[in-house]
């Protein structure tokens, strides 16, 4: 029973004769952890479950917060968030999401757990993920949509429950497969089950193994519908309303259109079936991953709405800049466990999170307004801003941070190439220098500083298959762009491309300039040290043009990478899968390649 003790606290316990009827709130039982019974019994049980979940989350958070917010963040995403998912799948959404009518002030169970998870996110990322509406919306999206990976239990409860019904219901009553063989139902012996779902509703054929169009019609229609059918119908309808239109509908402001493709294009009687042709007629069932597919369709629409809203912000708004300059490499930090090679200190993690979500830098905010360094060409010292534009755009800051960053990325990439079984040369010094003839030109070349001569020293040279082409010899040049107004400011010239829906424009803009820079340097070297007349092709330029192409590898201030980096990662994963897939105990090469792509990005 659910009862109220002498102190007024609500509890779940065993009914005894000594219990007063005035103290008993409701009766019920627990089946596999799920409360079934009177509304008050279910309410009290779920409230206790949510409270216990919240307590566990707060305990773990308090123990880890001071030690490693990175570890706490990973636990929040992968361990704490799923704790309450079981009840969102198996309890009516109205009991999990909606506040109880009798106690309107009480938070719904899902909201209680969501609040606790959000407090952990505030501890790991910063209070901006709660206070800023755009950061909060990003936090609720999955990482693959440039979100924070912390889904709201209240927002996913309908999809979780509907997916559980779609998965379980066809197995509950007797049906036949496409060969006419009878399949026993899990609840065959319970009277009324066949009438509830409709005899033959889940009979299979060659196209639909567990029932075709209209398979849930008997379940959701009728004057005497049970609460389970009402809850399922409502959950499915709300999922459809949450994904109004296709993902592009957000740009057309088509707020009243229902989805026109995917699972949610179908009404409740066809739940679980997909219309591939887009004409409203189901063509196949979805086999497995039902909740994932439902959530993904809803989240695609929400991402489209968020993308539209963020693009409408002022070009100088840092939240807009951050959103438009994140891609697959930017979000790796969200899923990386701290270890010897990937551990971040608490201040470092706070900086990474703030940059990703477009919030002010904690370090720079603390020093905002202070003056440091020397201005351009001996001018006045620079002023620290809250986002770090000034600090990150100055290459002369003591410590050589720019060079260290470049070299660390270069060495890590070379190590990854070799780990994937590829031979790679790093900083190929002798590729062009031997082409300068003996004489005054060569003497002048030798008198140059090593930094100047390195202008024609490729970062990498290797033979590899890129983009489906045959194996060729490529020069690869690593470039890093930093947080500065020249690249990310409103005068950087990226607005036109961004208005067309493009993202990560600065790194691609920098990548496009690399090949021309190489040719220009080669021409200047020929004309200055080899005696080549302007307009003619000298030995250095001829050697450069003998290679297939120079592949630019550009990394940006938000961890974003250019297309060249993604091509290299794909090529290395392909080569590594050939070498390692058996040692990885993968079933096939493709499975190993997917794991290696994630590994190389990290």
Predicted feature locations:
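Nucleic-acid-interacting cores, centered on viral/eukaryotic replication and modification enzymes
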Residues: 1-602
């Amino acid at each position: 029973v659910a009862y109220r003790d002498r102190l007024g606290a609500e509890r779940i316990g065993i009914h005894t004769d000594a219990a007063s009827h005035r103290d008993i709130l409701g009766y019920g039982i627990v089946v596999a952890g799920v409360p079934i019974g009177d509304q008050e019994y279910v309410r009290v049980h779920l409230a206790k479950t949510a409270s216990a979940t919240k307590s566990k989350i707060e305990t773990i958070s308090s123990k880890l917060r001071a030690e490693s917010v990175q570890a706490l963040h990973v636990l929040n995403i992968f361990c704490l968030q799923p704790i309450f998912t079981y009840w969102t799948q198996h309890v009516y959404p109205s009991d999990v999401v909606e506040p109880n009518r009798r106690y309107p002030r009480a938070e719904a169970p899902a909201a209680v757990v969501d609040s606790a998870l959000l407090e952990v996110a505030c501890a790991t990322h910063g209070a901006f993920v709660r206070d800023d509406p755009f950061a909060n919306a990003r936090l609720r999206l999955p990482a693959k949509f440039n979100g924070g990976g912390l889904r709201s239990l209240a927002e996913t409860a309908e999809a979780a429950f509907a997916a559980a019904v779609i998965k379980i219901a066809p197995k509950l009553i007797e049906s036949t497969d496409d060969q006419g063989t009878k399949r026993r139902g899990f609840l065959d012996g319970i009277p009324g089950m066949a009438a509830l779902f409709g005899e033959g509703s889940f009979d299979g054929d060659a196209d639909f193994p567990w029932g075709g169009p209209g398979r849930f019609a008997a379940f959701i229609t009728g004057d005497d519908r049970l609460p389970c059918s009402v809850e399922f119908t409502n959950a499915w309808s709300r999922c459809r309303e949450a994904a109004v239109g296709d993902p592009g509908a957000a740009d057309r402001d088509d707020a009243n259109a229902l989805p026109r493709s995917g699972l949610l294009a179908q009404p409740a009687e066809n739940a679980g079936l997909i219309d591939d042709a887009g004409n409203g007629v189901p063509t196949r069932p979805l086999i497995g991953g039902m909740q994932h597919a439902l959530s993904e369709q809803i989240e695609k629409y929400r991402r489209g709405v968020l993308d539209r809203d963020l693009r409408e912000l002022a070009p100088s708004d840092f939240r807009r800049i951050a959103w438009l300059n994140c891609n697959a490499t930017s979000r790796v930090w969200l899923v990386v466990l701290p270890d010897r090679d990937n551990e971040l200190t608490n201040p470092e993690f706070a900086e990474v999170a703030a940059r990703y979500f477009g919030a002010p830098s904690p370090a720079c905010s603390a020093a905002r307004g202070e003056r440091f360094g020397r201005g351009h060409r001996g001018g006045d010292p620079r002023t620290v801003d809250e986002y770090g534009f000034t600090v990150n755009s100055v290459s002369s800051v003591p410590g050589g941070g720019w060079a260290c960053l470049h070299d660390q990325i270069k060495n890590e990439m070379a190590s990854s190439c070799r780990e994937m079984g590829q031979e790679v040369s790093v900083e190929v010094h002798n590729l062009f220098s031997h082409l300068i003839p003996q004489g005054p030109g060569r003497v002048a070349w030798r008198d140059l500083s090593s930094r100047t001569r390195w202008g024609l020293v490729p970062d990498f040279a290797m033979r590899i298959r890129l983009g489906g082409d045959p194996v060729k010899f490529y020069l690869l040049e690593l470039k890093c762009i930093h947080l500065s107004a020249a690249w990310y400011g409103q005068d950087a010239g990226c607005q036109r491309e961004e208005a067309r829906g493009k993202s990560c424009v600065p790194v691609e803009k920098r990548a496009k300039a690399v090949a021309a820079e190489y040719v220009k340097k080669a021409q200047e070297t020929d004309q200055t040290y080899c005696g080549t007349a302007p307009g003619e092709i000298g030995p250095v330029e001829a050697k450069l043009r003998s290679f297939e192409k120079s592949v630019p590898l550009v990394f940006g201030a938000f961890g974003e990478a250019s297309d060249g980096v993604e091509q290299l990662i794909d090529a290395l994963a392909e080569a590594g899968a050939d070498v390692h897939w058996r040692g990885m105990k993968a079933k096939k090469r493709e499975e190993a390649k997917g794991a290696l792509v994630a590994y190389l990005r990290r």
